[in-house]
A protein has these predicted regions:
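Catalytic nucleophile loop of clan PA
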Residues: 146-166
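Short N-terminal segments immediately surrounding and downstream of signal-peptide cleavage
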Residues: 8-26
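A short, polar/proline- and glycine-enriched secondary-structure boundary/capping micro-motif
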Residues: 56-61, 152-156, 173-181
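Secretory targeting and sorting signals
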Residues: 1-8
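C-terminal cap/linker of serine protease catalytic domains
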Residues: 88-101, 170-203
Length: 203
């Protein structure tokens, strides 16, 4: 007796911590992590990730549990902060505020030393570490959170408050400090531009 084919899901389930693939017109693909998903002031379904993961116009594809077709597009980026904005097709995406062991209920400011923050990345999952410093000039936080390639864009939270994203590790993954953009700075830049993503609120 033939085994019935498994139907593809009607919508991709995505939230902060989901693995995403970003594909350019040449077919090059990067694997990163979605920082957060929600609606902007105009009601559009949008997300945020690390800017170095792709460029405006690149297709965004869920890495897991999907049929490999795009569900969104990078529509804007902020190179000084290494932040990118994704506009999603609401007919193809079911946004959630919990991925794995991490829940996001709002946004806020990073903690100071020796506060602990955690991230949820597509490569290393949920890991936590002490906050070494927050650079208010460069809008960065330095933490001891373990990250590896593919964790770029991962949400950094304190409790359930989204305070930043993962952008890079210094020299040695999971041993050296990790650098990330603060969510205050990311949302401030997006709001100031007044385009897609302005007025963002997470699911």
């Amino acid at each position: 007796m033939a085994t019935p084919a498994t139907a593809a899901p009607a919508q991709a389930v995505l939230g902060g911590g989901s693995g995403i693939l970003l594909a350019d017109a040449a077919g090059d693909v990067a694997a990163c992590t979605l920082t957060t998903i929600g609606h902007d002031g105009a009601g559009r379904l949008v997300g945020i990730t690390a800017g170095h993961c792709g460029d405006p116009g690149d297709a965004v594809i869920p890495e897991f549990g999907w049929d490999g077709t795009p569900v969104g597009t990078i529509v804007d980026d902020y190179p000084a902060l290494d932040v990118a904005v994704v506009q999603f097709d609401p007919a193809r995406v079911a946004p959630v505020n919990q991925v794995g062991g991490m829940t996001i209920t709002g946004t806020g400011s990073p903690v100071d030393f020796p506060g602990v923050a955690c991230k949820d990345g597509r490569t290393t999952g949920v890991t936590c570490g002490v906050t070494w410093l927050t650079d208010t000039v460069r809008h960065e936080t330095w933490t001891q959170i373990c990250v590896m390639e593919g964790d770029s864009g991962a949400p950094v939270v304190v409790g359930t408050t989204l305070v930043g994203m993962i952008n890079a590790f210094i020299q040695v993954p999971c041993l050296s400090p990790t650098v990330g953009t603060t969510m205050d700075a990311a949302l401030g830049a997006i709001n100031a531009a007044g385009g897609v993503g302005a007025g963002f609120r997470p699911i």
